Amino acid sequence: IALKCRRHFVTIQVGEACPFIEEILSTISSIICDLQTLQVHTFYEAVGYMISAHVDQVAQEQLIEKYMLLPNQVWDDIISQASHNVDILKDPEAVKQLVSILKTNVRACRALAHPYVVQLGRIYLDMLNVYKVMSENISQAIALNGVVVTKQPLIKNMRIIKKETLKLIAGWVSRSTDNSMVLENFIPPLLDAVLLDYQRTAVPDAREPEVLSCMAAIVYKLGGHITSEVPKIFDAVFECTLE
């Protein structure tokens, strides 16, 4: 319904005081409170398709802000706690919440496409910092307990955070419409965080293959714009992957 009728949700229909999307966003907490996690993710994707149909950029950005309010509140709370005590990012419940929030963002990005940039810009640097901390946590756990530790639920969820982060970035870049903006604002911190982590991860089992698919998607999308960064990408991923 959201896909086929998206324009109807963002324009005022006969008998309505405001577009239906406004009503959905103002009651979103009561709508999702009884849904399972997977249903919440599907709901967010559906609402994202509705918002993507809005033709006014300013109004659309305001809708996106309301739309992401709930996950952003939880995200901000965890990031705030982590800024005082990074060990919160080893807490199973916090890690589980981050997994769900990132999956929600992946679905929102899929639906919104390039306009998702307003949300991505809000969480981007914190998300890359979380990525680096998760890598350190995973490497420490493997060093202490061996590769078998990667089967534990907490470590699995830490790896999912890394995978969903890469999926989110690759998904948005592939849908973006401004290559120069992507290259200037999003690629430098990404390469610094992800490539360095991949290269220095001593245990092959701790490396995420999604790093390779993310880099491939970015190079494919940006083409000639990213040529200058290709040697850096090769230096970080080629030799250590083959080994």
Walk through the language-model features, giving the residues of each:
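Karyopherin-beta/Importin-beta family HEAT-repeat alpha-solenoid scaffold
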Residues: 1-243
